[in-house]
Structures are given as C-alpha cells and as structure tokens.
C-alpha cells in the first residue's frame, strides 16, 4: 500500500511519515530526523524498478514452524497482479546467508521451515545461484526435520527439484503450484509463462515419483476477457488433475492491472 499509493496515505490525518518497501526496515533511521510539521506526511520511497535491497528474515510468531524468506520481488508482470509495482524486481539472499538462518532455527529447537518468497523459483538472480542449489544445501542442515516449499511457478518447478524432493529426508512431498486458469486462452490474457499442457505434465511428474504427494493449486476466476467458454474449459481441465486442494479467488481489478 505504501509503495503503491504513498500520496493517499500521506493525506490521512495524523500520518507523519510514509516509507516505501526499501525503506521500511530502517524506520528508526528516519524517525530520528522526523520533525512534527503541519500538512501532509513526509514520503520517502524508491521507484519499484529501482529496489535492490534484500533483507532476509525468519519468523515464527505463535506458530510451531518457521518461515524463512529466501526471495522477494517479481519480474513477471502478469496482467492481474500489482506485486512487481509494490515489491520491486526479483532479488534474493545468498545461500550462505540463508543457511546461517536455518542453522539458527535448528539451534533454537525449531524443527520445520517453510521457504517463502514472492517468486521463489526465480531465486538466484542477485547471486548467480539457483533455487535447486539452495534446496540441496539446506537439506544438509542438521537439526531441521522438515522443509516445505511455498508457492512455486510451474515453469520454474524443474524435474530435478521434483526428483530431489522425492528422495529427500527433509523436504516434504508438499507442493503449492499456481495454475490461475485452466484455459490456455486466459493464461495468454494473463501473460502467464506456461500453458495447460506444461502444468499437467508437472502434476503427472510429481505423482509419478511421489504418489501420495500433496498438491495445492491456485485459481483466479472472472478476469477481464474470460468468456463462459473459457471458464468451462478451465473447469474441465481442473477436474482432470490429480490434486489435493484448490484455492479459488475472484479477480480483483485494481490500478496497474489489465
């Protein structure tokens, strides 16, 4: 919100300071220089395309599992999504940094880590590494009993990742894969980077090596340009998938979506 509509927030009564995505983690630095003034709040932001900072974090809150952020931002610019404008370009921490975070979790008694990010399969753009490299190294951290991979794009879920999870002692056979639509025509409207044939092949690959794997799938309905025929095509496609769970959302039209 602050990255997308800073002026709107600055006009809210009693708002003194609005920080963008790159500045928010250093809020104390800005508070020292903040002076109460009449008028709208002070805005300090960076253009989304210029955001380069990655701040690794690992949180648990009141949960029994930890969430380790390995990547942030997205370069995909799907027509229904504002994340690239709110979170900036794809970037990530180094494998060495993230392994230290996992080791800290293990030392504190944590047993499960969920790997999170905006587009985690795109991991490595900042460091010249790959998500598969990260998976293999984290699998060697003693003390962690289970990892889960959060939502990963089907075109970035490689066979080598699937095969590795199938034989890993620590990576759970648990996948969350955004389909968004089961209609190839709608996928084109969305500017997605795969078609239904590729998506189905990923499901079949997972089930061929992990018959009991859990597979969750995201769907969006009602996007601009989706006809009744396209919707029915999507329903038929989904019925033919061997999956465990559906997350279904209605399209939400917002500024910067198409």
Q: What are the language-model segments listed below?
A:
Residues 1-122, 175, 197-204, 208, ...:
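Proteins enriched for Cys/Gly/acidic motifs involved in redox and nucleic-acid/cofactor modification
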Residues 4, 107-231:
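Conserved SAM/AdoMet-binding glycine-rich loop
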Residues 36-39, 143, 170, 243:
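Generic structural signal for secondary-structure transition and capping sites
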Residues 66-67, 80, 149, 186-189, ...:
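Residue-level recognition of specific faces of alpha-helices
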């Amino acid at each position: 919100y602050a990255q997308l509509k800073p002026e709107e927030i600055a006009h809210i009564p009693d708002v003194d300071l609005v920080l963008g995505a790159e500045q928010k983690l250093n809020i104390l630095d800005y508070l020292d220089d903040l002076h109460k003034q009449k008028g709208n709040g002070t805005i300090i932001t960076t253009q989304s395309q210029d955001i380069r900072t990655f701040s690794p974090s690992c949180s648990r809150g009141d949960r029994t599992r930890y969430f380790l952020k390995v990547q942030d931002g997205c370069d995909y610019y799907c027509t229904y999504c504002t994340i690239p404008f709110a979170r900036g370009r794809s970037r990530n921490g180094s494998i060495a940094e993230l392994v230290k975070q996992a080791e800290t979790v293990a030392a504190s008694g944590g047993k499960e880590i969920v790997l999170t990010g905006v587009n985690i399969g795109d991991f490595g753009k900042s460091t010249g590494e790959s998500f598969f490299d990260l998976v293999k190294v984290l699998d060697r951290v003693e003390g962690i009993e289970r990892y889960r991979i959060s939502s990963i794009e089907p075109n970035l879920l490689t066979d080598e990742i699937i095969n590795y999870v199938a034989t890993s002692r620590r990576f759970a056979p648990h996948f969350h894969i955004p389909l968004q639509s089961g209609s190839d025509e709608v996928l084109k409207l969305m500017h997605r980077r795969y078609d239904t044939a590729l998506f189905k092949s990923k499901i079949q690959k997972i089930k061929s090596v992990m018959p009991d794997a859990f597979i969750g799938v995201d769907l969006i309905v009602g996007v601009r340009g989706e006809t009744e025929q396209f919707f029915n095509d999507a329903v038929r496609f989904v019925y033919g998938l061997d999956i465990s769970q559906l997350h279904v959302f209605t399209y939400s039209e917002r500024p910067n979506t198409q």
